[in-house]
Amino acid sequence: MNDKKFAFVMCANNEQYEKEALYYIERLEVPEGYSCESVVIREAESMAEGYNRAMQLSDARYKIYMHQDVMITEKKFLKKILSLFKNREIGMIGLVGSPVFPENGVMWYGDRIGSLYTQGSEGYGTYIFGQVAAPCEYVEAVDGFLMITQYDVPWRADIFKKW
C-alpha cells in the first residue's frame, strides 16, 4: 500500500464524460510528496465489480471512487481529503450522505446532508441537501457519485449488480 498516493477510480461507458472528468482531475493541486493515478474501468459488469477490479490494480492508499460524470472543480480537493483522513477512524468520506439509512434501503428517499455543485434547470449552482455542522459528520450511507476511502474493503458485487 502506497500511503502517498491517490487513485481516481471510475467505471466508464461514455468517452466524453470520461475525458472531461480526467481533464479536471489533472488540474488538481497534488500535495507535495504525493502522486496520483487514474484507473478507468470499461465494460464493467457493475459498478461494484469494476471498483473491485480497480482496487486490485492500484496500490494507492486513498481511492476516489467517482461516477464518470463527476467533475472535481475544487483545486485543493486532495489536501482536504488528507485533512479529514488524519482521523484514522474515518474509513470513507463523501459529499452527500444519509445520517440514518432509510428502512426501504434507498438513500435518496431518506434525509440527506451535504452539498454539491451541479447543473439544474436554472443553470449551475450549489445544491444543499442539509446543513453539515462540522467538516465531517457521521452518516450511515454515502451517495455513490463520489466516495473516498483510505482503507480497501471489497465492494459487494453479489448485491450491487447494476450501474
Per-region residue spans from a language model:
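A recurrent flexible, glycine/aromatic-enriched loop bordering the glycosyltransferase active site
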Residues: 125-149
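A short beta-strand-loop structural module common to alpha/beta enzyme folds
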Residues: 34-46
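N-proximal low-complexity "stem/linker" segments adjacent to membrane-targeting elements
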Residues: 1-27
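Catalytic metal- and UDP-sugar-binding loop of GT-A-like glycosyltransferases, i.e.
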Residues: 66-68
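Conserved donor NDP-sugar-binding/catalytic core segment of glycosyltransferases
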Residues: 44, 71, 75-114
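Donor nucleotide-sugar recognition loop
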Residues: 140-141, 152-163
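Glycine-rich, basic loop-to-helix element that forms the pyrophosphate-binding segment
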Residues: 44-58
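Short aromatic/hydrophobic "clamp" motif used to bind/position activated sugar donors
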Residues: 63
